Design a protein with these regions (language model features):
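Charged DNA-binding/catalytic regions of mobile-element recombinases
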Residues: 1-229
Length: 229
């Protein structure tokens, strides 16, 4: 598969592979020299391909000893599921490429993968995606809004988790993030999911019992359920 690039002028995906063609963005005022109709906007592209879209991103977390740890996350757009994460102090293109195999074993790979233009995604990473039959979608320079799901996910992790803890090291950060993602996937509700969690929660009526409070993420958050006495 090829690589889609986002045009910095109108936000429309552009491709370097003739097997995937997305022309000028809708609303640009012209159908192009070929006379072909204008394509979907970037927002429409995200909506129309949500079932086959994933995005990746890195963010950093400092430790108590002033080391900087890099967290790599893989997010499936459908139901906002975090499908994989890992932590390292020294990320490389080879390490990042290996994470994609860990995230999508066998035939579970998405059709498109959205990422920014960081140099960490080198030849090794791009070759791995090509072998997995994944088309890269590159965001325009300095345009984090074009990768909204991943950016929002990183913001949630910071605000709801790592900004409230002192990280001791890699193992400690993995344990913290595992706890947070258990909460995020199974308990945290989303307006875009009709106030459901990424892993669907069963609606409990009053007949199910009294409401009980279950601490999660070391007490930073709580899950509320009904439980029979």
């Amino acid at each position: 598969m090829g690589t889609l690039n986002l045009n910095g002028g109108n936000g429309a995906p552009q491709t370097t592979d003739t097997s995937v063609r997305i022309p000028a963005a809708a609303g640009s005022g012209s159908a192009g020299k070929s006379g072909s109709p204008p394509s979907q906007t970037w927002k429409a592209f995200l909506h129309n391909h949500v079932q086959g879209l994933a995005s990746v991103d890195f963010f950093t977390v400092p430790t108590v000893s002033f080391r900087v740890l890099f967290v790599f996350i893989v997010l499936a757009h459908h139901r906002r599921r975090v499908v994989y994460f890992n932590v390292t102090e020294h990320p490389t293109a080879a390490w990042t490429a290996q994470q994609m195999l860990e995230a999508f074993p066998e035939d579970t790979a998405p059709r498109y993968l959205i990422r920014d233009r960081d140099q960490i995604y080198g030849d090794c990473f791009r070759n791995r995606l090509r072998d997995m039959d994944i088309t890269e979608v590159l965001t325009a320079p300095q345009s984090p809004w074009q990768n909204p799901y991943a950016e929002r996910m990183v913001g949630s992790i910071r605000r709801e988790c790592v900004d409230h803890v002192i990280v001791l090291g890699e193992r400690h950060l993995r344990r913290i993030l595992n706890s947070y993602f258990d909460y995020y996937l199974g308990s945290r509700t989303h307006l875009s999911l009709a106030k459901d969690a990424p892993t669907t929660r069963v609606v409990q009526g009053p007949e199910a019992g009294e409401i009980v409070e279950i601490p999660q993420v070391g007490g930073l958050h709580h899950r509320y359920e009904r439980s029979a006495a």
